[in-house]
Curated annotation (Swiss-Prot):
Native organism taxonomy: Bacteria, Pseudomonadati, Pseudomonadota, Gammaproteobacteria, Vibrionales
Keywords: Cytoplasm, DNA damage, DNA recombination, DNA repair, DNA-binding
Species of origin: Aliivibrio salmonicida (strain LFI1238)
Reported function: The RuvA-RuvB-RuvC complex processes Holliday junction (HJ) DNA during genetic recombination and DNA repair, while the RuvA-RuvB complex plays an important role in the rescue of blocked DNA replication forks via replication fork reversal (RFR). RuvA specifically binds to HJ cruciform DNA, conferring on it an open structure. The RuvB hexamer acts as an ATP-dependent pump, pulling dsDNA into and through the RuvAB complex. HJ branch migration allows RuvC to scan DNA until it finds its consensus sequence, where it cleaves and resolves the cruciform DNA.
Listed Pfam families: HHH_5 (PF14520), RuvA_C (PF07499), RuvA_N (PF01330)
Written domain comment of the UniProt record: Has three domains with a flexible linker between the domains II and III and assumes an 'L' shape. Domain III is highly mobile and contacts RuvB.
Top-level lineage group: Bacteria
Main location: cytoplasm
Oligomer status and interactors: Homotetramer. Forms an RuvA(8)-RuvB(12)-Holliday junction (HJ) complex. HJ DNA is sandwiched between 2 RuvA tetramers; dsDNA enters through RuvA and exits via RuvB. An RuvB hexamer assembles on each DNA strand where it exits the tetramer. Each RuvB hexamer is contacted by two RuvA subunits (via domain III) on 2 adjacent RuvB subunits; this complex drives branch migration. In the full resolvosome a probable DNA-RuvA(4)-RuvB(12)-RuvC(2) complex forms which resolves the HJ.
Gene Ontology MF terms: ATP binding; four-way junction DNA binding; four-way junction helicase activity
Record protein name field: Holliday junction branch migration complex subunit RuvA
One of the protein's GO biological processes: DNA recombination
Length: 206
């Protein structure tokens, strides 16, 4: 069982990253709310891991804190919610927003998340409302809005490739290609990095 990785951050291709630990490169999928907080490529990173073993694959889901990982594990306990959908849910809104939406039974907000229909949103509320009491959601994540995006410049070099990267990331989170392209084009501005485009696209849906 892999619980934590500490090593050199080699690649950042949202929502995936590659981290080298003792000469071995690990591919890790990470919610965008966590991805925004990663250090620059070439520096040391510490990532808490949720390890999934399937017949056809071994998957690593990464988080910056144990609390983020704990919330993810609570989300995927809900009926019909697997790791992929859990990743999309915690990419579409911050932990605080998600906890507040569940506590307030805000179905209309939850259904805006990729892959979350009305029935899934209702299940999340029914099954998670009691479990999330006392979580203190305010400190689960470092607010993404305060993160400097300067370090993201090593991800993407040209505006068009940044937009392509953002669209690909949104598709991998569950949005349809046409919808992903529309989301990015509506928020795109000159010199925006892929991470900025993804963040603003996701914010526009909530």
């Amino acid at each position: 069982m892999i619980g934590r990785l500490r090593g050199n951050l080699l690649e950042k291709q949202p929502p995936e990253l590659l981290i080298e630990v003792s000469g071995i490169g690990y591919e890790v999928q990470m919610p965008m709310s966590c991805f925004y907080e990663l250090p620059p490529i070439g520096t040391e990173a510490i990532i808490y891991i949720h390890y999934v073993v399937r017949e056809d694959a071994q998957l690593l889901y990464g988080f910056n804190t144990k609390k983020e990982r704990a919330l993810f594990r609570e989300v995927i306990k809900a009926n019909g919610v697997g790791p992929k959908l859990g990743l999309a849910i915690l990419s579409g809104m911050t932990a605080s927003q998600f906890v507040q939406s569940v506590e307030r039974e805000d179905i209309s907000t939850l259904v805006k998340l990729p892959g979350v229909g009305k029935k899934t949103a209702e299940r999340l509320v029914v099954e998670m409302k009691d479990r999330l009491k006392g979580w203190g959601a305010g400190d689960l994540f470092t607010p993404a809005d305060t993160t400097s995006m300067d370090d993201a410049s090593d991800l993407i070099s040209s505006p068009q490739s940044a937009q392509d990267e953002a669209v690909s990331a949104l598709i991998s989170l569950g949005y349809k290609p046409v919808q992903a392209s529309k989301m990015v084009s509506q928020v795109a501005k000159p010199d925006m990095t892929s991470e900025s485009l993804i963040r603003e696209s996701l914010k526009s849906m909530i």
